[in-house]
Amino acid sequence: MRTFNFADLLEIVAETVPERIALVHGQSELSYSALNEQSKRVAAVLSSHGVGRGDQVGLQLINSPEYLTGFFGACRIGAVPFNVNYRYSPNELHHLYKTSRAKALIFNRQFSREIKDACARNYLPPVLLEVDGNELGLNLVDEITKVSVGHVEKLNDTDLIIIFTGGTTGYPKGVMWPHKHLFFSALGGGGFFHADGAISEPKELATRVSEGMLLVTMPLAPLMHGAALWTTLIALFAGHKVVLSDEANFDATHAWQLIREQQVNIVSIVGDAMALPLVEALEANQAGLEQDRWPLDGLFHIGSGGAIFSQTLQKRFTNVLPNLIVSSSLGATETGTLGAGELETEEGIMRYAPRGDLEVVVDGMRLAMKGEEGILARSGMVPVGYFGDEEKSRETFVTIGDVSYALGGDAARREEDGSVTVLGRGSMCINTGGEKVFPEEVESTMKAHAVVDDVLVVGVAHEKWGQQVAAVYCANVPEVDEQQLREFCRESLAGYKVPKVFFRVDTVQRNVVGKPDYAWAKSVAEDAPS
């Protein structure tokens, strides 16, 4: 009997369209049959080294077929795959290996030094599998040749996947998702490309795949980022082709070349940090500076999740490609994908029409009344907690009445008509003279100004107001009239939300997938000469 375990779902697709191309990476292609077979062999390797149900398997890999075969291979034996941010310091890696209780680690050779340094702090995953060498661990390719695919573990809907958060407010936390819950809450339940919506039984996936459109999807963020992994899995479980860049670091020019060569239809990004270089390269191409080397007839959608995709940049994309659909979706590792707000809003960053799975929770104990603010929450198929952290789990995953909720961290308000306005990241809220200011709203306004390329907004100490609003920004012109910036902001924002001080930098610092580094921005603002 088929389950919603992701290895089972991949096998359903592979049995339905075995010869269809599943994955393109550089010059290599994998059919669905080959992807499924290689995943089984990785599962056999893990099993041969004592890895089994419930054991944690880390994936410290750049975007590559091995990331996915490692992921599905772990799923196939009931083990628990988890993402490892390869930009972490040895100290952060040590913390991650130890707290995750990793039984196995699949990694690229280029990370051997960092892994050695981390393991020198007295925790070493027992099974080390190196995909492109044997400097530190066993060579995965060699190990695959030694095994045969034998007994298949009985799979369950409740087998777990752990997704570690970005760690922007301290060490990362591992969110434990049952496969079935993640399939429906983050991947749309197989319904993103079908008018009938989500499936109800795993076997229905075969019909969806055989009858569906043949689309090409390209995630530009690393697969270690939840949004990129979710985009990839959505495409694979729809029988689409997934294109992964063979460049270790994001490069807009290379991305457009791949989009053209592979006739990509759907591109997934993470916020303005990716959107800005992409649209600048696109505009240069459109202006003839690149001699129109990127005909993009097949591209119809660019979607962002995990960070702000500003309206200004969305408009720049559609100015060049008028038929392009651009979207910005809200979501979190703890809540899954919430989608784009359907309603216009004069405040905050997004507004949702009333729906059964979205609520505003106050103090983690009760649902908000109309007009009341709290934390945005999702009910239904939600995670079961943070791995190894019962205290944080109790704070984030709550039960009200007999309904389970996951709190995503965004402040929100229940409106009089039942709709929900998302105000911004609650942990970043600035309190100035008793008024709340959410950085994302101010950042979106500033980014609409033609000279501002990127900005982070933080609160800094103020003798009278407690905190004042500070903007750390970079610009595309030599000189900026900051008073003019204030006046521009005041056209859209209440006076207390307008930045009182500005700090210009060469580059606004973000992490590898474009998420803001607010600690850095705060240090810039606080350490600047007064």
Please identify what each model-predicted range represents.
Residues 48-49, 76-144:
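Structural core segment of the AMP-binding/adenylate-forming
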Residues 186-219, 224-268, 281, 285-288:
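Conserved AMP-binding/adenylation subdomain of ANL enzymes
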Residues 147-166, 170-173, 207-216:
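Conserved pre-ATP/AMP-binding loop-to-beta segment of ANL
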Residues 88, 95, 105, 260, ...:
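AMP-binding/adenylate-forming catalytic core of the ANL superfamily
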Residues 1-4, 135-159:
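Flexible, low-complexity linker/hinge segments
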Residues 237-240, 265-269, 280-348, 357-359, ...:
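Gly/Ser/Thr-rich phosphate-binding loop
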Residues 31-33, 160-197:
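Conserved AMP-binding A3 loop
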Residues 2, 28, 45-88, 436:
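Conserved AMP-binding/adenylate-forming
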